[in-house]
């Protein structure tokens, strides 16, 4: 495969080409994907020998290059650093549909790297990378039960669209990524605007039709350039040893698994395992470490099989619940006195404390990535400390799992967040998982809903989330509501659904089997809705609506609209004016280019004072209006009166009174308050005022009247006569 070969098809109205044989030839498999003007190189490498351990060491990397969008990276070094959240989420998105398609017992290390070379914003580099990952694997000698493909699906005015453009995505009420094989779906990730279960299912199946076509396209590539798959040694337990361990432990393991409380159940299972392992240690076998490792693996498989058999055949779960039963719920708001909003949500032995923080819009998150989004004002972060599962370990920066769970919660809540116009705040939610026995990401969504309501955020509707599970033995399957950790670990599916009472706002599905049929998806969505509505009813019994007032410790933000041409007046030369307002009131001021002014402070009185100052600065004088101002300067020809901050006018000496005035000081003194009427604003914007226009004129006998002095105002600019 030394010569370049190109395979082309159409994808969502754009040309898709796969190039192999020219780049990254030392990798086990590599493909350059051209989708429109988006270009992504994916290379896959598999180790020749198994790696020690009882897991499959698969690593998926997605590398964003800033040159792909014509940008220079920020920061001092001016080069790409740690992956962005979007890159991390994309790597997870690719990993999830690929991982189930490696054989059970495969222990060779596999690494897949997708590098983004060029980005056309209307041609998703993420979907190109997913396709490239599949192609790189299927044409390599790495054993892989693909191909797979993934597509984005949108819905505009009821019509489904594959790989929507940026413009189409803005109009769509569904943002769905679905992946799978020709036969079945094995990964779903979605955000939505309260869509029905039926609409979401239709979107998933619509996407699967396109996935089938892309899988057929890859079969053509495999036929032309695919390598023969290498022979590998899968980890398989010794049949005699397996039978021996089963005979000694099956009954005890079944009893231990039925222990309802998590910690007690874990202790009971551990006791069974220790008893069996100790019996083999006592035999003092020659290859003891290898035997003990194999026995430990067999015991875990027995634990898995017994749990699955209990659920599938007896329809009983380890904690004694029915298959559609939700664990006991409890919740509380306002636990933390100084934060802006807090919510504690507990479901069984899973507990999340969510905190809402409000800030001025200037504190939004700046996005320096490959997409068109420049900033976001709503964030949800998820933290999972070791103590939440009763374990010790180092505390590191958020990993892929924490970033992924935080993003899922953010997607679930995004639709109900009020617009900037309705609520001009940056909103940050942090969910601290304090206990975990499954479904902690969904607990964080419920806790975040409580925290926002407690903070007074006017969300469109409360949102709740639930995690569904599946145990499938042959053609028989059992769908589980509100799965706990053990059911997640040994089950076949983790299907998370979040939404309001009116529809779905987020959905995420990962499976460990080849795929799911439409029937199973339909039943899982229906059962998830029942659970979601039950949880929503509980949440609204704790707090049914946003608090009417924000926390005393939250910034109070007032908006004011001014003419864009007045912005310079508010800012002043070198920022002098705006800094003076900030110094005087202690507020924070942000001004948008359209003239929207945001004023933020914990003290509403200072907010109002800042508003009054700005209103005075941008206020325009109108002829005929009456003002009360202070005398700021006196000249021989009249007095200058400050009408409001930044604007003054001249009361000519002849406009002070109806009778003749000899000296200005006879009527007005410096600092006097005087009520005046605007009689003229000249072409240069200078304001002429009159005091006498507001005074009653005294009647005089005809003979006593004296000729009036000539009125002198600011000179008007005379236009030159045209010749």
Curated annotation (Swiss-Prot):
Cofactor section: Mg(2+)
InterPro entries: ExoRNase_PH_dom1 (IPR001247), ExoRNase_PH_dom2 (IPR015847), ExoRNase_PH_dom2_sf (IPR036345), KH_dom (IPR004087), KH_dom_type_1 (IPR004088), KH_dom_type_1_sf (IPR036612), NA-bd_OB-fold (IPR012340), PNPase (IPR012162)
Assigned EC number: 2.7.7.8
GO molecular function, one term: RNA binding
Record key words, sorted: Cytoplasm, Magnesium, Metal-binding, Nucleotidyltransferase, RNA-binding, Transferase
Presence of the UniProt keyword Transmembrane helix in the record: no
CDD domains: KH-I_PNPase, RNase_PH_PNPase_1, RNase_PH_PNPase_2, S1_PNPase
Residue ranges of domain KH in the record: 555-614
Compartmental location: Cytoplasm
Catalytic activity: RNA(n+1) + phosphate = RNA(n) + a ribonucleoside 5'-diphosphate
UniProt keyword Repeat, yes or no: no
GO CC, alphabetical: cytosol
Region called Disordered, residue ranges: 692-723
Domain S1 motif: from-to ranges: 624-692
Bias (Basic and acidic residues) ranges: 693-723
One GO BP: RNA catabolic process
UniProt-listed NCBIfam families: polynuc_phos, PRK11824.1
Family per similarity comment: Belongs to the polyribonucleotide nucleotidyltransferase family.
Functional note: Involved in mRNA degradation. Catalyzes the phosphorolysis of single-stranded polyribonucleotides processively in the 3'- to 5'-direction.
PANTHER family (alphabetical): POLYRIBONUCLEOTIDE NUCLEOTIDYLTRANSFERASE, POLYRIBONUCLEOTIDE NUCLEOTIDYLTRANSFERASE 1, MITOCHONDRIAL
Protein name: Polyribonucleotide nucleotidyltransferase
Organism: Listeria monocytogenes serovar 1/2a (strain ATCC BAA-679 / EGD-e)
Gene: pnp
